């Protein structure tokens, strides 16, 4: 009941028909984040793309200037010295066939998966499990790499991965309600800038169509896309 009252009060605070300036939207999303935990602030971007076409896919990995406020659990497929390097860098789970067996058994104790190139034949067999969860290592995202230390460190320091869904919408957590407003603004601008730079060649017409902010338990707050440089 308290949850419903909070949501109703938050919805009454937000004008759903208004597109707010970025600073105002940030202040509002922080104001309505009244849960008893530190809510995640999420951004949603509606893009003028059709991800069903290969030349219109938008996907990437970005290190936010102020981190996300969340510590990712990192899993690494590696052997020998590279496995030791991963552990030393702070990876949560490291292994080869033993880790693959755990994944096949449903034990997926990581939020980001990294692999050395020689492990991809093994990891490839886990595609049906890792793929739908967005955990499949990808060389384009820097998660298939010999620089295991760098990849683990980056993941632990506030990297966010983004990928357009079928409707051309991208969601990403860009901080916590406890963040200062200017820190959230820096993260948001960095994220939107990265998405704009990732504009695919096949995209036609207006690319960045809509933007919104929300907290874990709060309503969506529309953001005026003119707050961001045209992309």
From Swiss-Prot:
Keywords carried by this UniProt record: Repressor, Ribonucleoprotein, Ribosomal protein, RNA-binding, rRNA-binding, Translation regulation, tRNA-binding
An annotated GO cellular component: cytosolic large ribosomal subunit
InterPro entries recorded: Ribosom_uL1_bac-type, Ribosomal_uL1, Ribosomal_uL1-like, Ribosomal_uL1/biogenesis, Ribosomal_uL1_3-a/b-sand, Ribosomal_uL1_CS
Parts forming coiled coils: none
GO function terms (MF aspect): rRNA binding; structural constituent of ribosome; tRNA binding
A GO BP annotation: translation
CDD domains per record: Ribosomal_L1
Source domain of life: Bacteria
Keyword Lyase listed: no
Subunit structure: Part of the 50S ribosomal subunit.
HAMAP family: Ribosomal_uL1_B
Described purpose of this protein according to its UniProt entry: Binds directly to 23S rRNA. The L1 stalk is quite mobile in the ribosome, and is involved in E site tRNA release.
Family stated for the protein in its record: Belongs to the universal ribosomal protein uL1 family.
Protein name: Large ribosomal subunit protein uL1
Gene behind the chain: rplA
